[in-house]
Amino acid sequence: KTGMLGSSELVELVAATIDKYDLHNVVIDPVMVCKGCDLILVPDAAESIKKLLMPRCDIITPNTVEAAYLADMPEVTTVEQIKEAAEKIVAAGAKSVVIKGGERLSDNSAIDIFYDGKEFVEMAVPKIYPSYNHGAGCTFSAAITAGLANGLSMKEAVLQAKKFVTAALKHGFAINNIVGCTNH
């Protein structure tokens, strides 16, 4: 499982390591955008993730802003656009993708969509307020990794991870008057 990879050199090293050791169950959490909508990575690192890691991963877990970048779309703000982005990401080489709609969609549900090139699985739960969600994306990709390590199929690992993160969000807590985090 990867997290934030801040340079193209680091992305190249991860790609070479995946190849060298013929790694399986590779979970890429692209971490290109945090709370806002602007890329926090230098452009060459983001482009390297797209070109070098997407084709090597078993699953990639972008939020909607990251998915728009990875799919070369101007924005991803609806369920239909999430599905379109998912198709493009898989067509670009990822074996599967789960796009985290979370709180970014204007619905009352936190919707994540899994796609493995064959079927879409929509996972919707009511949004949780207050939203102490710092670390939710990293927790989600780590929980998918744990499920795969325990022998679950990709779909089962994603579904279990969604339940785990939902519980962690329900018990989240404030860090200060601006942000709070998941509790797991």
Q: Model segments located where?
A:
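Short pre-catalytic strand/loop immediately N-terminal to key active-site residues, enriched for Gly-Thr
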Residues: 120-134
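Glycine/small-residue-rich loop that forms an oxyanion/phosphate-binding "nest" at active or ligand-binding sites
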Residues: 2-55, 59-62
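Glycine-rich beta-alpha junction loops
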Residues: 6, 32-34, 66, 102-105, ...
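Short, small-residue alpha-helix embedded
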Residues: 68-69, 130-154
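Nucleotide and nucleotide-moiety/phosphate-recognizing core
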Residues: 19, 119, 155-156
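Short, charged, surface-exposed loops that flank catalytic or proteolytic processing sites
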Residues: 75-82, 149-159
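Conserved phosphate/ATP/ADP-binding segment of small-molecule kinases
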Residues: 43-119
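Charged C-terminal helix
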Residues: 155-184
